[in-house]
Amino acid sequence: MKVYLVGGAVRDRLLGIPVQEQDWVVVGATPEELLKRKYRQVGRDFPVFLHPETKEEYALARTERKSAPGYYGFICDFSESVTLEEDLARRDLTINAMAMDEQGNLIDPYQGQRDLEEKLLRHVSSAFVEDPVRVLRVARFASRFHHLGFRIANETRLLMYSMVKQGELAHLIPERVWQEWQKSLEEKNPEQFILSLRSCDALRVILPEINSLFGVPNPHQYHQEIDTGIHSLMTLRASSELSEEPLVRFAALVHDLGKASTPIQAWPKHHGHEEEGTKLIRALCARLRIPNDYRDLAVTVARAHLNIHRLCELRPNTIVKLLEQVDAFRRPQLFHKILIACQADAESCGKTVVYRQTQLWNEILSECVKVTPQTFIVQGYEGKAIKEAMHQSRVACVERIMTSWKSNEK
């Protein structure tokens, strides 16, 4: 029985970046042998075991043979005769198909180290086409390593394109699409996930709602980049510089989703795209089974972002209503996320003007939250009268703040 460190841990060691988790492959062993050594089996479709002390994953070396379309259509062989090279051959990219033995010697049958040096994301073999999830994984690794200068090898991109044309992506299950997309939202360059899928025509199949934004014009006076798809990616990029939270990044990306559905004859104007966008976001989240917290933040940003930008043009009553609608008084941290997504939208336009709205909205909120029910309860207010009195008091508060702003500008 021989044990090898494999996959991402080897790759990251060679890149000199922190190793998040270690996975191991066991060659020349049986499930019974590992169970005798107190390993605990957790794999359902093939034997994966947890080390009795470290709790790290140990998998028996295996081969995979395509037996049916889609992600689950494989027959696995994990007999004692399977070699390490055979196990590494089933992996997606050469940089993920390296191993180290217990003495630290590198086993690299598919030139992964060379591709690390050349900063290439290259498939291991033609078996790449057997698993449609690999298209998503390559796009995710592009988002992870873009800042290091990595790019997808031309031959791998062509293979991804052929998989799209052959309809392989139709077998992707919604949960796996979201799993890879969500992971990409946590990377340094989440926009590269979208760009990589678009470069092989996979975006049209996997995320048609986002793909349809490309080619939709924006008013030049507000958007120097003009194209809505490009603007959405610029907003995603800007949001990743402002926040590490994938919820915020997702909301930033889809905030203008409704622009592809506005009447073409009205372009480049997009009246009503906010509400149209909320419908598309809800449908997208339902289709891919995206968690409710992602959906709710994205819907709120899509609906409110224009009014957030136009703060100084709004009436005090409208401002208080907006704060009530987004639940800012009870959930100020949620409102903070909304403001970050809106700031990303504004800053993505390439303007050098500082986005003052974040500071101004926070100033209003910090004063308005000082208005509490107790003030009106002791005055004899009851029921809905308390809510209305609080609303009017907050409106008066906003009026005072805005008057102060105007006097300071003189």
UniProtKB/Swiss-Prot annotation:
GO terms for biological process: RNA repair; tRNA 3'-terminal CCA addition. It catalyses: a tRNA precursor + 2 CTP + ATP = a tRNA with a 3' CCA end + 3 diphosphate; a tRNA with a 3' CCA end + 2 CTP + ATP = a tRNA with a 3' CCACCA end + 3 diphosphate. Mg(2+) binds at E21, D23. Magnesium is required for nucleotidyltransferase activity. InterPro entries: CCA_bact (IPR012006), HD/PDEase_dom (IPR003607), HD_domain (IPR006674), NT_sf (IPR043519), PolA_pol_head_dom (IPR002646), PolyA_RNA-bd (IPR032828), tRNA_CCA-adding_enzyme (IPR050124). Its EC number is 2.7.7.72, 3.1.3.-, 3.1.4.-. ATP binds at G8, R11, R91, R137, R140. PANTHER family: MULTIFUNCTIONAL CCA PROTEIN (PTHR47545:SF1). Comprises two domains: an N-terminal domain containing the nucleotidyltransferase activity and a C-terminal HD domain associated with both phosphodiesterase and phosphatase activities. A single active site specifically recognizes both ATP and CTP and is responsible for their addition. Catalyzes the addition and repair of the essential 3'-terminal CCA sequence in tRNAs without using a nucleic acid template. Adds these three nucleotides in the order of C, C, and A to the tRNA nucleotide-73, using CTP and ATP as substrates and producing inorganic pyrophosphate. tRNA 3'-terminal CCA addition is required both for tRNA processing and repair. Also involved in tRNA surveillance by mediating tandem CCA addition to generate a CCACCA at the 3' terminus of unstable tRNAs. While stable tRNAs receive only 3'-terminal CCA, unstable tRNAs are marked with CCACCA and rapidly degraded. Monomer. Can also form homodimers and oligomers. This is Multifunctional CCA protein. It comes from Legionella pneumophila subsp. pneumophila (strain Philadelphia 1 / ATCC 33152 / DSM 7513).
